[in-house]
From Swiss-Prot:
Lineage, opening ranks: Bacteria, Pseudomonadati, Pseudomonadota, Alphaproteobacteria, Rickettsiales
InterPro entries associated with the record: Membr_insert_effic_factor_YidD (IPR002696)
Keywords: Cell inner membrane, Cell membrane, Membrane
GO CC list: plasma membrane
Protein's name according to its UniProt entry: Putative membrane protein insertion efficiency factor
HAMAP family: UPF0161_YidD
Superkingdom, natural source: Bacteria
Record's bilayer topology term: Peripheral membrane protein
Family membership: Belongs to the UPF0161 family.
Amino acid sequence: MTRILLLLLTFYRYFISPLLGGNNCRFYPTCSKYAKEALNTHGGIKGLWLIFKRIIKCQPLCDGGYDPVPLTK
């Protein structure tokens, strides 16, 4: 599952994101880099949950800033 999600993420980063204007993320690391790190660190299920929470925060009413992937326990 993680490999499929990483493949979809790579497709998004190289083919869809440039069509949307490139880097528009309010956070560091960017949402796509965060997603890749979350999937590699936490696997598919928890990684998807972390990605979902991050994307919900990536909107005009949020200040953004530094928001790293949480460490594993």
